[in-house]
């Protein structure tokens, strides 16, 4: 796809991930970083942060584990949780824009795992202190999207 877009001067929007900020940690993060490097100059790389939804989520994702009461521990991490509907509106904002480059797609407001678990009735779980390979905090820089008129509307704690 990148080759076609480059050869035909077609703008391409593609999914990246906040994991690129520590791209050396795992194969997924490496693959997203490679995509960003290989992307054509007139493309838009969207670094999605912690995407969630009440309706659809992988069973191994924290939000789903809290929702289904299958989580066995909590961490002290803070995550930038962004609802899938806000992802859709961010993409809809980017499509007609002339923006090119890579940008963060998140709320810019990290929420602690403990606060989320407490809201969902799971705050009683033990805290796991040792979590190698996990970032303490993820937080999107939303300035570029906000300058295009986009703002997230769904708060995970509401």
List each language-model region with its residue ranges.
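Structural element of the ATP-grasp superfamily
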Residues: 1, 39, 65, 144-146
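Conserved Rossmann-fold NAD(P)-dependent oxidoreductase catalytic core, especially the SDR/UDP-sugar
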Residues: 1-30, 44
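Active-site proximal helix/loop that lines the substrate pocket
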Residues: 17-20, 50-56, 110
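NAD(P)-dependent short-chain dehydrogenase/reductase
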Residues: 27-29, 33, 37-88, 92, ...
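Short aromatic/basic micro-patch
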Residues: 45, 81, 110, 139-140
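Core catalytic loop region at the nicotinamide-binding pocket of NAD(P)H-dependent oxidoreductases
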Residues: 71-72, 94-105
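C-terminal "lid/loop" region of Rossmann-like NAD(P)-dependent oxidoreductases
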Residues: 74-76, 102-103, 111-118, 122-142
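Amphipathic terminal alpha-helices
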Residues: 120, 155-158
């Amino acid at each position: 796809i990148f080759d076609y877009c480059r050869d035909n001067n077609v703008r391409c929007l593609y999914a990246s991930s906040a994991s690129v900020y520590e791209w050396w940690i795992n194969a997924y993060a490496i693959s997203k970083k490679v995509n960003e490097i290989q992307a054509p100059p007139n493309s838009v790389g969207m670094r999605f942060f912690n995407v969630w939804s009440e309706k659809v989520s992988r069973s191994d994702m924290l939000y789903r584990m809290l929702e289904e009461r299958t989580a066995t521990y909590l961490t002290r991490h803070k995550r930038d949780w962004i609802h899938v509907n806000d992802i859709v509106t961010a993409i809809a904002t980017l499509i007609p824009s002339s923006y090119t480059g890579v940008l963060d797609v998140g709320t810019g407001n990290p929420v602690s795992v403990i606060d989320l678990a407490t809201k969902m009735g799971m705050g009683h779980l033990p805290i796991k202190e040792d979590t190698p390979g996990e970032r303490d905090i993820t937080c999107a820089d939303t300035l570029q999207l906000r300058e295009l008129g986009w703002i997230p509307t769904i708060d995970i704690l509401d």
